[in-house]
Amino acid sequence: NNDETAHLKEVVLEFTKTTYQSGPIELVWVTDVPIPFWNPKAGNDNYFNNYIYQSWTYKGNTIGTPFITSPAINEKDSNIVTNNRVLAFYFAGLYEYNHLQCELKYSYSINKGTYSVPIGEKGQHSMMFKVGRDIPSLKDLHVQLCVGWDKGAFLGNSFALGVCAKKKF
């Protein structure tokens, strides 16, 4: 069959590390002279948290990376980011075979909380797999099946299944 084609269309690999914020050198001011001291917790920039302005959050959501946990999902009614020390790996791929589009997104993160409130090292797997196809006999109709899965000590375990039909006009 001449219509059978297979090819990888897109690949994304990402690595995020915010576990070591600003390094171990702390400047201590003695009169007018800054003296550097070694302190393993000196960085403590506390990414995404600032008590004067909103920092990298907007209406309770973090901006820039999904791995820094949004204040919107805090168990307690708190407007701060409670997990900004993260080591994360992300992979995404889009593959097409014989008019069937397959998409996979997978991430693994190690979540450490903040310097002031550490939570140990809580691992979290997250995966989404989507397969879709245009239906030639029904012009401009596209159907998809999607599966999502989370497993880990940080956000817990969950599973979701979705079915979608799209019609273009």
Predicted ranges, named:
Residues 1-169:
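Outer-membrane beta-barrel pore domains
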